[in-house]
Amino acid sequence: ENDFGTKLTIFFGNSWTKLQAEELRQVFDSEYQLFSDFVRFKGNEQTISFAKMALWARSGQLNLGVIPEKIRHYIDDSKDIADIIEAMWASQTNLVQTAQKLFMHRNSLQYKLDKFHGLSGLNLKNLDDLAFCHLLILNG
């Protein structure tokens, strides 16, 4: 980087599943626009995760394209995940407290979190991912 006088910025996009060809193009375009906006307005960070960038865009009232709709679809399609997100948010990501609030065994909770992670690419044990999903639920 220093040898060539350039600055690199790396964006770790989300892992998407169950998308048709047209949806994949829309999601890619939305992520590309999100990344471009981030570099233009806040290009001082060199690495940024998908959820952190999405939270930044939501706080700045920027357009996220089809991203919120797709993530919300994953939330709605996953049994109990909306309740899990709310309970995890209330218990500050503490899995034991979340399981107790939901009257669920901790291993069952972990299984549902892993299943949602595989489907949506978002790890709800990560506070940025959890906050993004929580905001999507709050905003309907």
Briefly describe each language-model feature range.
Residues 1-140:
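Cytosolic nucleotide-utilizing catalytic cores of signal-transduction proteins
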